[in-house]
Amino acid sequence: MAGRSQPVLAGVVTALVGFASSFTVVLAGLRAVGASDAQAASGLLAVCVASGISAVWLGLRHRIPMSVAWSTPGAALLVATGTVPGGWPVAVGAFLVSGALIVAAGLFPALGRAVAAIPRPIAGAMLAGVLLPLCTAPVRALVEVPRLAVPVVLAWLLLHRFARRWAVPGALVVAVAAIALTTPVSGLGGARLLPAVELTAPAWNVSAMVGLALPLFLVTMAAQNVPGMAVLVGYGYRPPFGAALRATGLTTVLAAPAGGHAVNLAAITAALAAGPDAHPDPDRRWIASVTAGTGLALLGLGAGAATALVALAPPVLIEAVAGLALLGALATALTSALAEPADREAAVVTFVVTASGVTLLGVGGAFWGLVAGGVMLLLFRRRSGGPTAPESTSAPVTTPSPGPAVEPVTTESPGPAVEPATSGSAGPTGTGRVGVTPRAAGRGPGRRGVPGRR
């Protein structure tokens, strides 16, 4: 009986940790690009349901524990971008285009190869620049609202030391308690506790497509889908990368009119469902990801109450909880950005330009960071006669699968050593290129979804 319940319990934990660790980032991001409280609640509901549908479909179809989540780094990108010209409808249009690009990457391997061609230091530096503003929020909160922020940060520190996966959820519980003790009950008087779908007709303009849709696609691919695949490969699975991109991209497109910004493979929380803690038998772990998807969809029903809570709290306190959730991703992104000595200056330029938050020609800093770092890298490599960075010494892992598959993946923590610390977000890992490229490949040995012999 315990063996049957083990993957179900692992799935419940995966859903709870994933939701509680980063829903504040999602709400902050949606509100930053112009969503009202009702539209932000609708967006959170949309990404929960879309993630759940994708996880259930992929788990049942392929019998692989492919956990799906919203793009936490993508939500941080929304915070860094702020309101785009044209407001919320244009942001919704950017979400839709980003989802369509993910579908295209699953259908056309060349697009996936183009994303994988972005040097890892540049991708990591861009992600670090996107995350930095939110990661400084805990410091600002300690200065601006110390009575509320000090207990939250202390709870995070203690739990991070003794129970890392519960550090951010625990900090959130303390924040909720602090808000409840300092906010009159009448503050919830007009709040809508159950979310309602708020559909928005998408609109488009060039600056939002370049400044939001394209960076959102790149961040989601490099910081979520690639590490998520690497986790599965590290646990011995041969996941169908193309199928995962098509499923998550399609659900992103469907969720966009309701305010959903991006759905993708989970990265850190993927280890909760794919590792031996989910079940000793790898063939049974897919039950954990299906349970997690179902649980996340149900947790979406609390989007209205979560939004009402965020609206009552001092904005800097909510940003502080979000920043604590992203510290692990920031550390990983910085490690990736500075891993190659020959590329460090270009990575630093990318980081500085992205973190500056500058807007030029209506396009945000993430795009210009990529451009600045890419140009500098190109000039330095051309002057020196080509790349001088040392090759990675890690042994690549090949993962054949039907249709679009994955190229050799290099990751710093490929197996059970993955520590589920925060949410489904993680920066690029390892060295070299971004690391996962869709391509055509034959079916590997064994049944579909059964881990290959290591």
Regions found by a protein language model. Name each.
Residues 5-8, 151, 210, 246-250, ...:
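Alpha-helical membrane-protein architecture signal
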Residues 7-25, 45-123, 239-327:
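Helix-loop-helix junctions within the multi-pass membrane cores of secondary transporters/permeases
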Residues 85-186, 291-386:
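Membrane-embedded alpha-helical modules
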Residues 374-390, 442, 449-454:
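Terminal cytosolic tails of multi-pass membrane transporters
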